[in-house]
């Protein structure tokens, strides 16, 4: 097979070529096809400037020659081969390196502020330029996770979860730059490793080393909940903790080992991952289990994309796996992304791109994936000098990662803002 018939198509109207079959060499690779498209565009518009393109055949990126790809994917050449082309994704550009005093366990950012949690028992708020704005101190042990509850003008509400078995709810006024502990959420009997705020921003869920999930109110009030602790003098309790005591609205039990990651799929449905090799879906209204996805190894992290309705998981066997959480077959993995050489400790879907996600690992590397190219990542972000422990991805195209080198790196990734529909 020396030549084959191909038709090129794209969703980007700026780069449309004639919708007719072309005869092209079967041995063509990405650079050859990119040259063909650019020549066709030049013929239509003399002022066309060269653009690097990527190509998809049957929804998979071309990473070899066309004939090899067609053979591997078992595609017939009897008919015209349909080839989609998209503008090549440029590499994320490094922006800031923000030094911390200890390991960075967690990060959550928006368009204005970055919130990090650290093994030095504090959380910190940073500007996008890497300026330290506020240190949030009050825990007696390592901060394991952080989350923004809401950002309302000058007043923000945030959460910190800790190895000290508590979650603290804070109010921060950015104009006065004052932070106040409003509530100390108590009820877990082990390290609180993961927290997630619901879509209404009125509740949050926590997951713990004690195998339990708990749902709490995320609304600051002036009320203190009573807590049953017969062996603890009340006076001592008052002086030890910051903020009013808050107890959970509901406890969800079912996991047999530590809960490592939790998220809300919508206002009524929770998803949790555990060291017991399962991912479980829960009814957040009743607290009942809805379904279980079973794996063969410990799950460290999960992320859900409402755009593609897929769940991504990271495990101790170095694989990132994609699941359909609605599937009746609870062990069906849709796709495995295999490139890391250590435990996968962080996964995060792109907020504005249904095919892209990042993963971080104990191998010190952050990888940017496109699910249409599952055999290799789009890019390796290899700035860290030690274990990667957390990652985030903001609506405005910032990728962040933190780790055991005490550094938070930020990268600007324009492709997922401008090319959200690719």
UniProtKB/Swiss-Prot annotation:
The keyword rRNA processing applies. Residues 4-87 are annotated as: Ubiquitin-like (UBL) domain. Component of the PeBoW complex, which is required for maturation of 28S and 5.8S ribosomal RNAs and formation of the 60S ribosome. This is Ribosome biogenesis protein wdr12. Pfam families: NLE (PF08154), WD40 (PF00400). PANTHER family: RIBOSOME BIOGENESIS PROTEIN WDR12, WD40 REPEAT PROTEIN 12, 37. Coiled coil: none annotated. It comes from Danio rerio (Zebrafish).
């Amino acid at each position: 097979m020396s030549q084959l018939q191909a038709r090129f198509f794209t969703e980007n109207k700026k780069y449309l070529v004639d919708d007719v079959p072309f005869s092209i060499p079967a041995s063509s690779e990405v650079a050859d096809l990119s040259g063909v498209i650019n020549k066709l565009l030049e013929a239509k518009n003399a002022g066309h400037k060269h653009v690097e393109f990527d190509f998809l055949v049957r929804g998979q990126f071309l990473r070899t020659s066309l004939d090899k790809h067609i053979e591997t994917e078992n595609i017939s050449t009897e008919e015209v081969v349909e080839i989609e082309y998209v503008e090549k994704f440029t590499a994320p550009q490094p922006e800031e390196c923000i030094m911390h005093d200890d390991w960075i366990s967690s990060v959550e950012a928006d368009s204005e502020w970055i919130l990090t949690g650290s093994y030095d028992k504090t959380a910190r708020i940073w500007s996008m330029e890497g300026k330290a704005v506020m240190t949030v101190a009050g825990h007696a042990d390592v901060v394991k996770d952080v989350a923004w509850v809401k950002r309302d003008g000058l007043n923000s509400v945030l959460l910190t979860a800790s190895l000290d078995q508590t979650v603290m709810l804070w109010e921060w006024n950015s104009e006065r730059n004052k932070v106040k502990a409003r509530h100390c959420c108590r009820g877990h009997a082990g390290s609180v490793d993961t927290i997630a705020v619901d879509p209404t921003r009125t509740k949050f869920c926590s997951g713990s080393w004690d195998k339990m999930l708990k749902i709490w109110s995320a609304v600051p009030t002036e009320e203190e909940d009573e807590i049953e602790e017969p062996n603890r003098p009340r006076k001592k309790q008052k002086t030890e903790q910051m903020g009013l005591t808050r107890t959970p609205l509901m406890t969800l039990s079912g996991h047999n080992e530590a809960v490592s990651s939790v998220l809300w799929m919508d206002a009524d449905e929770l998803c949790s991952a555990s060291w017991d090799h399962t991912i479980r879906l829960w009814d957040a209204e009743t607290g009942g289990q809805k379904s279980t996805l079973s794996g063969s190894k410990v799950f460290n992290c999960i992320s859900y994309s409402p755009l593609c309705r897929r769940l991504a998981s990271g495990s101790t066997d170095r694989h990132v796996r994609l699941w359909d959480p609605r599937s009746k077959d609870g062990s069906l993995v849709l796709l495995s992304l295999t490139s890391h050489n250590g435990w996968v400790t962080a996964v995060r879907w792109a907020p504005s791109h249904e095919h892209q996600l990042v993963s971080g690992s104990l191998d010190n590397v952050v990888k940017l994936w496109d699910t249409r190219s599952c055999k290799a990542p789009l890019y390796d972000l290899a700035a860290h000098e030690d274990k990667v422990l957390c990652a985030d991805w903001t609506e405005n195209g910032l990728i962040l990662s933190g780790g055991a080198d005490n550094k938070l790196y930020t990268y600007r990734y324009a492709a997922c803002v401008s090319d959200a529909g690719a």
